């Protein structure tokens, strides 16, 4: 989803939850200090900057959209015109070149963009090919089966239509921003992601429990409890 909706607007609740879940997972692993890190489908670079600011030895961001990479680089250089801490590349995830090896890769809403099973498996293989043995992939992926049973609009996203067909149903959705932003993705099952990861050479695949930020005045604990009962996403943890 990120590839299609990355904007400069304040983050929606589901995006805030995603960022918290990813940071929590990174902290549980001991952080990224001294690691070589890769962020695939980096968008405007928020996760890549998180990795760099955490002390990664090297951080590389990859995205298929030249404009998103341009904006990510612009954010890095700022007004000084100096090179930033993140190295950015324009590349399609399924055909990503050898940029590593890396100790850690992150992918936020990458794999749901695969239009068929061939592309899905190619994405996982390209990520695995850039990782050292024992390295880790942390991927945030959408949860399937929500439409039409779950309303995610209070958290910033609405599924509008689900069309069966192909290797996975096509979802038409929109971000509840002002103005709304429409996007499409595929509704892959968790088992499809796991199968592709194992096929790519990952030794283990695990799923992290959903975690949400502490309650605040804007989003209290009942709000987050409702979110946890039917979360937008899950965190996939794969070891090479």
Regions found by a protein language model. Give the residues of each.
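SAM-dependent methyltransferase
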Residues: 138-198
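A conserved beta-strand element that flanks and buttresses the S-adenosyl-L-methionine
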Residues: 106
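A short glycine-rich, Lys/Arg-flanked "PGG" loop and its adjoining helix->strand segment in the class I
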Residues: 121-133
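Conserved class I S-adenosyl-L-methionine
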Residues: 1-32, 46, 50
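Class I SAM-dependent methyltransferase SAM/SAH-binding core
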Residues: 38, 44-95
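C-terminal lobe and adjacent flexible extensions of AdoMet/dcAdoMet transferase-like proteins
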Residues: 196, 200-240
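Short catalytic micro-motifs in class I SAM-dependent methyltransferases
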Residues: 109-113
């Amino acid at each position: 989803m990120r590839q299609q909706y990355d904007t400069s607007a304040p983050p929606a609740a589901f995006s805030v939850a995603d960022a918290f879940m990813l940071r929590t997972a990174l902290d549980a692993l001991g952080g990224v200090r001294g690691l070589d890190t890769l962020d695939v489908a980096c968008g405007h670079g928020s996760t890549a900057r998180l990795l760099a600011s955490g002390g990664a030895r090297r951080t590389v961001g990859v995205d298929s959209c030249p404009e998103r990479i341009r904006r990510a680089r612009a954010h890095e250089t700022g007004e000084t015109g100096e090179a930033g801490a993140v190295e950015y590349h324009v590349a399609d995830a399924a055909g990503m070149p050898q940029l590593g090896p890396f100790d850690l890769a992150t992918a936020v809403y990458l794999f749901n963009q695969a239009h068929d099973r061939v592309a899905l498996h190619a994405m996982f293989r390209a990520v695995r090919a850039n990782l050292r043995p024992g390295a880790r992939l942390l991927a945030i992926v959408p949860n399937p089966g929500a439409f039409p049973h779950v309303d995610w609009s209070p958290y910033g996203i609405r599924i509008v239509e689900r069309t069966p067909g192909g290797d996975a149903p096509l979802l038409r959705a929109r971000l509840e921003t002002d103005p709304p932003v429409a996007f499409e993705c595929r509704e892959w099952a968790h088992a499809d992601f796991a199968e592709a990861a194992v096929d790519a050479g990952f030794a283990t695949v695990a799923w992290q429990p959903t975690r949400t930020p502490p309650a605040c005045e804007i989003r209290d604990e009942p709000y987050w409890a409702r979110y946890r009962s039917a979360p937008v996403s899950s965190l996939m943890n794969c070891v090479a």
